[in-house]
């Protein structure tokens, strides 16, 4: 079944409306969740910080501390320091907090900023299981277009094309005994600003890991066809099989083709390398 598809910025916009309507304290900073698919076992929660009028805040200089608790276990409070990740360097970014979601249900997320400005707590629904393929799952073997099967201009909306990302089909990569990194992104049709930066980062990192399979999966098919629209009907088969609710995503698989990690939205410096070095 094809799922609804939403980008990081679209989710932030929807959350901003909901949060703004929930409080009349216009002086408070609000946090907007950017993680689309939080689930039990995740320790990677992304959020933006905004002023109530929508002005984007956040930088490495504005330190943020998070307190998180499940509403059905309010006596257990997790306090973590969030780190700031640039989405578009020098322009837009998100905070990442390693919250140990250990139960499903509604969680209250409170946060404080080093500027001392008042903030507004918010709620997050944590699912028992993620919507996407999860760590520990056998990665779906899905054929994806390669340079051997498809004209370069029909492979990707990332230009100029980085040919090493299109030498292997994803199903071939998962069965050749090497680690695999699958990047699901669509630079030309991204509903967030994150696809292009993620592609640039992974291309740079891949040069240091020649023994790893690197496969870019364009989110949509037929993007050069007349009448094309970036909608659910044009989702690539691999996007459907991996049950992606948004873009971009990275999935890291071990030598046996088992999912080791999933990374949503924005990539921290050294985050992917740490997974590949283990």
PLM feature segments, named:
Residues 217-247, 252-259, 269, 275-278:
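Thioredoxin-like thiol-disulfide oxidoreductase module
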Residues 81-113:
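Ligand-binding face of N-terminal immunoglobulin V-set domains in extracellular IgSF glycoproteins
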Residues 42-55, 64:
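Beta-strand-rich structural segments
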Residues 162, 170-191:
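Short active-site neighborhood of thiol/selenol oxidoreductases, capturing the structured segment around
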Residues 192-208:
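Typically the conserved alpha-helix immediately C-terminal to a functionally engaged Cys/Sec
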Residues 17-20:
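C-terminal motif of bacterial Sec signal peptides marking the signal peptidase cleavage site
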Residues 22-24:
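Bacterial signal peptide processing site
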Residues 116-172:
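N-terminal "domain-start" segment that seeds a small globular fold
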């Amino acid at each position: 079944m094809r799922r609804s598809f939403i980008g990081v910025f679209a989710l932030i916009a929807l959350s901003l409306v909901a949060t703004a309507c929930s409080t009349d304290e216009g002086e408070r900073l609000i946090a907007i969740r950017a993680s689309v698919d939080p689930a039990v076992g995740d320790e990677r929660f992304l959020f933006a910080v905004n002023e109530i009028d929508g002005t984007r805040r956040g930088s490495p200089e504005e330190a943020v501390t998070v307190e998180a608790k499940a509403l059905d276990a309010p006596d257990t409070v997790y306090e973590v320091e969030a780190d700031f990740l640039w989405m578009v360097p020098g322009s837009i970014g998100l905070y990442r907090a390693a919250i140990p979601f250990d139960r499903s249900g509604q969680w209250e997320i409170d946060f404080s900023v080093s500027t001392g400005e008042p903030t507004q707590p918010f709620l997050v629904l944590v699912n028992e299981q993620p919507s996407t393929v999860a760590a520990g799952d056998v990665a779906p073997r899905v054929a994806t277009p390669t340079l051997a099967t498809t004209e370069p201009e029909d492979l990707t909306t990332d230009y100029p094309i980085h040919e090493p990302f299109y030498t292997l089909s994803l199903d071939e990569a998962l069965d050749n005994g090497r680690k695999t990194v699958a990047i699901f992104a669509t630079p030309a049709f991204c509903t967030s600003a994150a696809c292009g930066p993620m592609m640039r980062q992974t291309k740079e990192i891949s040069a240091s890991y020649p023994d790893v399979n690197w496969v870019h999966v364009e989110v949509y098919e037929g993007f050069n066809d007349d009448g094309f629209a970036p909608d659910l009907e044009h989702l690539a088969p691999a996007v459907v099989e991996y049950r992606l609710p948004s873009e971009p995503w990275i999935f890291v698989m071990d030598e046996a083709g088992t999912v080791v990690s999933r990374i949503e939205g924005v990539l921290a410096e050294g985050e992917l390398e740490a997974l590949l070095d283990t």
